């Protein structure tokens, strides 16, 4: 039964819930805030589909190119680039898709900015909600069935998600679908929704107001500052960077509240599951400092469909050919596993009693000397050179 899957394997893609023909699979959220499947034995008809199709128990094969064309890219629209997490390539590809009458499926924040889920949309308003990375797990319950229905009705769909969610969708549908276009990203690992909610709750308490807008990896102090920017209903603003924000400390440096299975991800590999793969072009050489501060995406063109998507958006993109080695120089998580450094179980126990920042501080503290060295390097490289834009 799928409910006996080990926690360090299950990706939480929720595809087994959608594929079960008798509605026997549901999900239980554990104390780490991550969900895992449960099976109602009375409803289960023992067809075995959940196990046969699970992308964590069976690697989903891909015919995509194992040596894809690699580009550095960004949107030519300054606002789109500013509002996006990297260079805004997702927005331009999805906008062109909507303009041709297609549906987009991706991740949005809940109205209180404390959880995230996958939805299907067709308008620019939908696109504005879907753009931007949310660095914690999105709830995908029902999305596989909804996409399947649209495809059966002859509609075109552009799905974007983590590589394991893309693998789950491909496994659910069973064969390559002409009308389905797939996007994924280089994925370090996904975080616990409970940790993220606790992080926002604490900041709301400190600012005595509820959140109106959250931007992770805000460009206000430059792309490389990895800052979180939060606007509150009372008009106040929170803006902290990689050295001062406890979420970034726990995730970027410690992988402290990441889903357990992400330490042994099956999809950090080539060929990719999706038609296009996006990422951050960290460490890119030969671009101006201004461009680096505005954000630069890496794009892998993994298939003919990927090439079609790029062609459709090309008039709104800056695109230059680069190599895989250049990407690997600055992006270890394309192939490398993210290893958790702090004490994860203690962190989640503490989180039940203490504010988020205290739980991070007490279970993960970076060596002070390393931190000091990184901070001085950052100041020398960016702060003195930074331009306002
Ligand atoms: C959890 C996570 C880890 C990542 N790790 C890396 C990394 O190690 N290296 C790297 O180069 N890039 C990483 N990225 C990708 C990077 O942050 C950008 O999303 C990517 O470069 C595309 O940028 P963009 O500006 O074009 O688009 P954006 O506007 O940022 O892209 C938005 C698209 O991403 C999807 N998305 C956003 N959040 C989620 C989510 N929680 N779950 C599923 N789909 C989501 C949305 O549906 C939307 O379609 C990660 C992204 C996420 C969400
Ligand atoms: S990886 Fe996905 S399909 Fe497999 S058990 Fe976990 S939630 Fe279900
Ligand atoms: S690291 Fe792998 S398993 Fe974890 S969310 Fe990303 S693609 Fe899925």
Please describe what each predicted stretch is.
Residues 2-9, 15-32, 36-38, 48-66, ...:
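Iron-sulfur cluster-binding cysteine motifs and their immediate structural context
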Residues 181-202:
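Short, flexible loop segments at boundaries between secondary-structure elements
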Residues 1-7, 38-42, 244-253:
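Short, intrinsically disordered, charge-biased short linear motifs at domain edges
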Residues 170-181, 200-205:
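Short, surface-exposed basic-aromatic patches at helix termini and helix-loop junctions that form
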Residues 8-22, 45-57, 162-168, 257-270:
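Local cysteine-cluster metal-coordination motifs and their immediate loop/turn environment
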Residues 42-153, 327-343, 349-357:
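Flanking helices and flexible, charged tails adjoining ferredoxin-like Fe-S electron-transfer domains
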